[in-house]
Each structure stands twice: as C-alpha cells, then as structure tokens.
UniProtKB/Swiss-Prot annotation:
UniProt-recorded name of the protein: Copper transport protein ATOX1
Modified residues (Phosphoserine): S47
Free-text function comment from the UniProt entry: Binds and deliver cytosolic copper to the copper ATPase proteins. May be important in cellular antioxidant defense.
Subunit-structure text: Homodimer. Interacts with ATP7B. Interacts with ATP7A. Interacts (via dimer form) with SLC31A1 (via C-terminal domain); this interaction improves ATOX1 stability and controls intracellular Cu(I) levels.
Molecular function (Gene Ontology), one example: ATPase binding
UniProtKB keywords: Acetylation, Chaperone, Copper, Copper transport, Ion transport, Metal-binding, Phosphoprotein, Transport
PANTHER family linked to this entry: COPPER TRANSPORT PROTEIN ATOX1 (PTHR46365:SF1)
Positions of modified residues (N6-acetyllysine): K60
GO biological process: copper ion export; copper ion transport; intracellular copper ion homeostasis; negative regulation of apoptotic process; response to oxidative stress
Name of the gene this protein is made from: Atox1
Family to which the UniProt record says this protein belongs: Belongs to the ATX1 family.
C-alpha cells in the first residue's frame, strides 16, 4: 500500500487522539503519529486528497508532505 506523510499541527495527546479518531472512522488505513515532530505517516489505498480532507476534519492545520 502507498504511504503518505502529512504535517498536522498537533500540540498534545488530545490532538493526536483526534487524528486517530478521524482516520479510524475512515477505515482502510494504517498510520503512525509522530507527535513531537507533528507528522502523521499513513499507509492506505485512499488518495492523498481523501486523506487530507479526512485530517482536515480535526480542525488542525494540515499539509501534505508527499509520498514516503
């Protein structure tokens, strides 16, 4: 499965939980949250656009860093 890396403006565990919640709701994803570096690496068949839209539901500033 393709891997995508995103920058997400997470400042605490609650932010990471919000990211985890929206990704689990989307389904079909495996992900790793790097809170200190404010990055989320997602392995999924979903397009980067769908993943970006999903992460935007957290209300945090999100940007696509590219394939990993």
């Amino acid at each position: 499965m393709p891997k995508h890396e995103f920058s997400v403006d997470m400042t605490c565990g609650g932010c990471a939980e919000a990211v985890s919640r929206v990704l689990n709701k989307l389904g079909g994803v495996e992900f790793n949250i790097d809170l200190p570096n404010k990055k989320v690496c997602i392995e999924s068949e979903h397009s980067s656009d769908i993943l970006l839209a999903t992460l935007n539901k957290t209300g945090k500033a999100v940007s696509y860093l590219g394939p990993k």
